[in-house]
Design a protein with these regions (language model features):
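Charged regulatory segments coupled to nucleotide-binding catalytic modules in large multidomain enzymes
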Residues: 51-194
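A glycine-rich phosphate-binding loop feature that marks nucleotide/adenosyl-phosphate handling sites
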Residues: 1-16, 154-167, 196
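N-terminal, positively charged regions that mediate nucleic acid binding
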Residues: 26-29, 185, 189-201
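Glycine/threonine-rich ATP-lid/beta-loop region of ATP-binding domains
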Residues: 1-52
Length: 201
């Protein structure tokens, strides 16, 4: 019987564990439909957390789980790490040298594989084997999470530009209105409606 964590518990778990880092964004967790490898069913789940006090000057942190148990060793030999490295994260707002390898930035990537028989690389059960079916499913789950992250980053960029535009308008327009009013010998008009129209709000 497969035992996925589920979207709600993934988000709650990440929020609880990472509370001290105060991330600004939790991408909607992804739970893929069951697939099979070597006759054994498996499910891939993924989540991404971004911003806040997560360090931005180093590689992203990777949280790997198999049947709800954290995988703490042999990260480089694991299918989860390899799938993360193969995705072009530059398209989704993270830095990545040459479009391959572990991305850099203020993010934490979590991947969980639930299976009746997880294909580990060794008896130590520290890394998941890089089988094509598993790599493909991890990649698809990560892309969905990464798209959500990119949407958030685009939204934040638009907010930033709107705020900068508002600051410029607030600074320049009153000065222009005052000079024009002086030249025409009229009182300075109320600019609230004009600023609202310019800002499209």
């Amino acid at each position: 019987c497969l035992s996925p964590i589920g979207d709600t518990l993934i988000k709650k778990g990440l929020m609880h564990v990472l509370e001290g880092l105060r991330p600004e964004y939790y991408a909607t967790p992804v739970t893929r439909s069951p697939k099979a490898v070597n006759g054994n069913p498996f499910i891939i789940e993924a989540g991404i957390v971004y911003g806040g006090d997560i360090p931005s000057d180093g590689p992203v942190q990777i949280l790997r789980f198999a049947n709800r148990v954290p995988l703490l060793y042999q990260q480089g030999a694991c299918a989860i790490t390899k799938a993360i490295s193969e995705l072009d994260w530059r398209r989704y707002g993270l830095e990545q040298r040459g479009g391959k390898g572990i991305p850099y930035g203020p993010a934490i990537i979590m991947v969980h594989i639930a299976s009746t028989k997880v294909p580990f690389t060794s008896e130590g059960k520290e890394a998941v084997a890089s089988l094509p079916e598993i790599m493909s499913e991890i990649g698809l789950a990560l892309r969905l999470c990464a798209r959500n992250l990119k949407s958030h980053l685009n939204k934040m960029e638009r907010k930033k530009k709107t705020h900068a535009k508002f600051e410029i308008v607030q600074e320049i327009l009153p000065d222009m209105a005052q000079k024009a009013a002086q030249q025409l010998g009229r009182p300075v008009p109320n600019l609230d409606r004009t600023i609202t129209k310019i800002m499209n709000v």
